[in-house]
Swiss-Prot record:
Record gene name: EPHB5
Name of the protein in question: Ephrin type-B receptor 5
GO biological processes: axon guidance; ephrin receptor signaling pathway
Residue spans, topological domain Cytoplasmic: 586-1002
Extracellular compartment spans: 30-564
EC number from the UniProt entry: 2.7.10.1
Glycan attachment points: N446
Function as written in the Swiss-Prot or TrEMBL entry: Receptor for members of the ephrin-B family.
Keywords tagged on the record: ATP-binding, Glycoprotein, Kinase, Membrane, Nucleotide-binding, Receptor, Repeat, Signal, Transferase, Transmembrane, Transmembrane helix, Tyrosine-protein kinase
Gene3D superfamilies according to UniProt: ephrin a2 ectodomain (2.60.40.1770), Galactose-binding domain-like (2.60.120.260), Immunoglobulins (2.60.40.10), Phosphorylase Kinase, domain 1 (3.30.200.20), Transcription Factor, Ets-1 (1.10.150.50), Transferase(Phosphotransferase) domain 1 (1.10.510.10), Tumor Necrosis Factor Receptor, subunit A, domain 2 (2.10.50.10)
Length: 1002
């Protein structure tokens, strides 16, 4: 039995009080009365034993009211044992009962004659029973059948009886007992020799009242059977509220303690979206018209933000939709204001420095309500004599810091042609521009460049060498910017300081340098001069004289280059005239779907044009390395960490610091120790390939380390790594326009390689590297081969046993091992699909053989989610079975440029097209091996409604069904175009499955 405390001492603990005050502010507990003799005026009729013990009498209270009480005062004789028993009291569901006693006791000290036998206490008992069994004998009048509650002592006593009969010096005590398990109980009061009066008895139990708090309604709940009991009560969310998703909670609950007080809340309800709290969390009220609440919670409704309104003129809105011409970007919250596209940049101006142009402008007057304004630069070359024939600037034009996504209000444009009229458009865009049907606003300015110095000469070739001389030749500058008057050659011994250099002037693009030392490595640079002055020096090239005693050699296989060099000046004039006539002729031709009146890439295919040279054609592979790759002193390189591994060794991140120049980050491939001569040649072969390329969308070779260990290939460092893994990490974070910009860069790099008669053979997103400015560059030239310059059949036939990346490779390359620039175009289409699907694996989990079979059945990949139709159509063009029908990279670049200029073309999604569509693969085709008949197949593709049509036509076996055509479907009564297409697509997959059951020759 628990200990009892006085009512005056009962207090709520500190934590409970804090909870009550700060969390719920609940009302006080309820008392349910089971028995109350307070103010009783008629006979109560309780049973006493012995009869001369307790007696029921009438007295007056302090308000002069006549009340019935029980009293006993048998102190004269020792051994008193007087019992008073109540009637049977039903507990009415109570688990714990409280008894409040009003009584008075006479002070034993005031009765000296009986002081030794006098008591000032009495004892309270209870006895449980399912039925009323009371009689004069039962329950028995001793402690055995009774349960003691407590011995009650008076706090105050009186010394003499009031002559008026009033009750004096009243005591009030509360005791409790439980848990109760039977239908009812009796109370008994035992006197052992006191002189006292039992004025009133109240029997009650506590209940926690019904309450609505925290948007939940809790019913009236009885207190538990113990003082420390917590009775759980499950609440119900009020109207328009729902249970909050609190971790670990299951339902909304309160707990009723033994004193009838609510405490220990778990879970809670919150107002639904479109509703807010009213009446101190008593109810949820719909948001007024013109306001909204987007999510479940206790937040109030908010007024619709700027440029938005509630979708319906009714209360309870969960969102405010944007007004016409205003939008929210994907990164904006639902309560963010709607914003528009920015106006055009202001005060666009330019400054010309030689053939470079510095463009500056001010922010748009109207930013559309956003801070994320960016700028794109559109460059057009406009011949002065033919208005309206502006074409987009070529890839050689450079933009610093970038062309697209500028955050600065300035850009420097370099590598412009001299004496040419240019038009520059500066577009202002933000994150909602692509959501708008309006074209980006832009400012435009016309710029005419003046005559300029020649551009840098891209490379030099060694024609012959001796012990004391070297003969070199070089092509014309890509941009002569006038008539070349002569060339200046600068050279010095690599072992000496650059300040000790010598110069030589040549009127042709070939020179012989005399008086050199045997066996020495010399550094050469060349520059061209026009009437305006000298252009910049070319990059440094390293050539070595013969050792003493070696025979002079001449590269016979380069004889055409020698002849071409001698005739270079005359050839340039002829080529220029041909190029002008070609441009005029092309401008009059009918526009193709890919050109869009853009400038065509002019390849003279003659003297001075740079070609790719296969390193394997060199008798000495080291000669190719010396010619195409710059040797780097190992002391200039600092390796900081390993970032990967490759076939030949590790890939590292490091820094390169040339004397007198700034340090910059590089990627370093190292050749593992224990390599063979063949492995060394293969490892360095990639460097001799890369060293021939110079394009902003092709990985740049810094140089090689071959004179120390380990052997290294040093390239520029691409911060974001391979394109496929980068896209998977950033899934959904780029706009369609940004993805198209990446694709355009890849296509530009491949156009450059194709123009050099170079076939990549392994073009895939994994072999595209991405830098911090999202510039994509073609890399990994391990599988690449030289493309012979045969216009009728420019192919390379690979070795019969070489490994081929099936998912990226054109069918003719898989079947016949024939690789061409057209097969690279097929691979580029797969790269497009990878980019638009954020790095998803092409053909998903299909086996290589399934891929081969599907392509042979004319199946093609479907558009990735949200892929613009125009991009998927371009992919399908790249996947034409006849390689002659595939577009050239030049046309692909033009098509992507058109999309970038008109972003509205990128908004349409889906596979619809005006031209006949090819069957498209599905990521989840029917599992044909598990299907046994036509009915199961129709159910699998959700076309079960046509079972009867197939049955009546006798179309039962897959072999017969696989030969059905569109006319057959129409004949058996399938007329809905969408259903026809769905069934035909599945029939194509059925064909692939049936073909897999037969041996396939690859």
């Amino acid at each position: 039995m628990d200990s009892n405390a006085d009512i005056s001492a009962r207090r709520v603990s500190g934590m409970d009080w804090l909870w009550l005050v700060c969390f719920f502010h609940l009302v006080t507990s309820l008392e349910e009365i089971l028995l109350d003799t307070t103010g009783e005026t008629s006979e109560i009729g309780w049973t006493s034993h012995p009869p001369d013990g307790w007696e029921e009498v009438s007295v007056r209270d302090d308000k002069e009211r006549q009340i019935r009480t029980f009293q006993v005062c048998n102190m004269d004789e020792p051994g008193q044992n007087n019992w008073l028993r109540t009637h049977f009291i039903e507990r009415r569901g109570a688990h714990r009962v409280h008894v409040r006693l009003h009584f008075s006791v006479r002070d034993c000290a005031s009765m000296r004659t009986v002081a030794s036998t006098c008591k000032e206490t009495f004892t309270l008992y209870y006895h449980q029973s399912d039925v009323d069994i009371a009689s004069q004998e039962l329950p028995e009048w001793h402690e055995g059948p009774w349960t003691k509650v407590d011995t009650i002592a008076a706090d105050e006593s009186f010394s003499q009886v009031d002559r008026t009969g009033k009750v004096v010096r009243m005591n009030v005590k509360v005791r409790s007992f439980g848990p109760l398990t039977k239908h009812g109980f009796y109370l008994a009061f035992q006197d052992s020799g006191a002189c006292m009066s039992l004025v009133a008895v109240q029997v009650f139990f506590y209940k926690c009242p019904a309450v609505v708090k925290g948007f939940a309604s809790f019913p009236e709940t009885f207190a538990g059977g113990e003082r420390t009991s917590l009775v759980e009560s499950l609440g119900t969310c009020v109207a328009n509220a729902e249970e909050a998703s609190t971790t670990g909670s299951s339902g909304v609950r309160l707990h009723c303690n033994g004193e009838g007080e609510w405490m220990v809340a778990t879970g809670r309800c919150s107002c639904k979206a479109g509703y807010q709290s009213v009446d101190n969390e008593q109810a949820c009220q719909a948001c007024p018209i013109g306001s909204f609440k987007a999510s479940v919670g206790d937040d109030p409704c908010l007024l619709c933000p700027a440029h938005s309104h509630a979708p319906l003129p009714l209360p309870g809105s969960i969102e405010c939709v944007c007004q016409s011409h205003y939008y929210r970007s994907a990164s904006d919250n639902s309560d963010a204001p709607c914003t528009g596209i920015p106006s055009a940049p202001r005060d666009l101006s330019y400054e010309i420095v030689g053939s470079n142009v510095l463009l500056t402008w001010r922010l748009p007057k109207d930013l559309g309500g956003r801070k994320d304004v960016f700028f794109n630069v559109i460059c057009k070359e406009c011949p002065t004599r033919s208005a309206g024939t502006c074409v987009r600037c070529g890839d050689n034009v450079q933009f610093e810091p970038r062309q697209v996504g500028l955050t600065e209000s300035r850009v420097q444009v370099s590598n412009l042609l001299a004496r040419v009229q240019y038009t520059f458009e500066i577009q202002a865009v933000n994150l909602v521009t692509e959501l708008s049907s309006e074209a980006p606003q832009y400012a435009t300015i016309n710029v005419s460049t003046s005559q300029s110095v020649p551009s840098a000469i891209p490379m030099m070739h060694q024609v012959s060498r001796a012990t004391s001389s070297i003969t070199l030749s070089w092509p014309q500058p890509d941009q002569p910017n006038g008539v070349i008057l002569d060339y200046q050659l600068r050279y010095f011994d690599k072992a000496e300081d650059e300040d000790n250099s010598f110069t030589l002037t040549s009127e042709t693009n070939m020179a012989t340098i005399l008086n050199l030392s045997p066996g020495k490595i010399y550094v050469f640079q060349v520059r061209a001069r026009t009437a305006v002055g000298y252009g910049p020096y070319s990059g440094k090239m390293y050539f070595q004289t013969l050792m003493a005693g070696e025979h002079s050699e001449m590269a016979q296989d380069r004889l055409p280059l020698i002849v071409g060099s001698a005739l270079g000046g005359l050839a340039f004039l002829v080529i220029a005239a041909i190029a002008i006539l070609a441009i005029i002729f092309k401008s009059k031709r009918r526009e193709t779907p890919y050109t869009d009146r853009l400038q065509q890439y002019i390849s003279t295919r003659g003297l001075g044009v740079k070609y790719y040279i296969d390193p394997s054609t060199y008798e000495d592979p080291n000669e190719a390395i010396r010619e195409f790759a710059k040797e780097i002193d190992v002391s200039f390189i600092k390796i900081e960490e390993v970032i990967g591994s490759g076939e030949f060794g590790e890939v590292c991140f490091g820094r390169l610091k040339h004397p007198g120049k700034r340090e910059y980050t590089v990627a370093i491939k190292t050749l593992k120790s224990g390599y063979t001569d063949e492995q060394r040649r293969e490892f360095l072969s990639e460097a001799s390939i890369m060293g021939q390329f110079e394009h902003p969308n092709v990985i740049h070779l810094e140089g090689v380390v071959t004179k120390s260990r380990p052997v290294m290939i040093v390239t520029e460092f691409m911060e974001n790594g391979s394109l496929d893994s980068f896209l998977r990490q950033k899934e959904g974070q780029f706009s369609v326009l940004q993805l198209v910009g990446m694709l355009r860069g890849i296509a530009a790099g491949m156009r450059y390689l194709s123009d050099m008669n170079y076939v990549h053979r392994d073009l895939a997103a994994r072999n595209i590297l991405v830098n911090s400015n999202l510039v994509c560059k073609v890399s990994d030239f391990g599988l690449s081969r030289f493309l012979e310059d045969d216009a009728s059949n420019p192919t390379y036939t690979g070795a019969l046993g070489c490994k081929i990346p099936i998912r990226w490779t054109a069918p003719e390359a898989v079947q016949y091992r024939k690789f061409t620039s057209s097969s690279d175009v097929w691979s580029y289409g797969i790269v497009m699909w990878e980019v638009m699907s954020y790095g998803e694996r092409p053909y998903w989990d299909m086996s290589n053989q399934d891929v081969i079979n599907a392509i042979d059945q004319d199946y093609r990949l479907p558009p990735p989610p949200d892929c613009p139709t125009v991009l998927h159509l371009l992919m399908l063009d790249c996947w034409q079975k006849d390689r002659v029908q595939r577009p050239k990279f030049e046309q692909i670049v033009s098509a992507l440029d058109k999309m970038i200029r008109k972003p509205s073309a990128l908004k349409a999604t889906g596979t619809g097209s005006s031209r006949p569509s090819q069957p498209l693969l599905s990521n989840s085709p029917p599992d044909f091996p598990s299907l046994s008949n036509a009915h199961e197949w129709l159910d699998a593709i959700k076309m079960g409604r046509y079972k009867e049509n197939f049955d009546q036509a006798g179309l039962i076996t897959f072999d017969v069904i696989s030969r059905m055509t569109l006319e057959d479907l129409q004949r058996i009564g399938i007329t809905l175009v969408g259903h026809q297409k769905k069934i035909l697509n599945s029939i194509q997959l059925m064909k692939v499955h049936l073909n897999q059951l037969e041996p396939v020759e690859v």
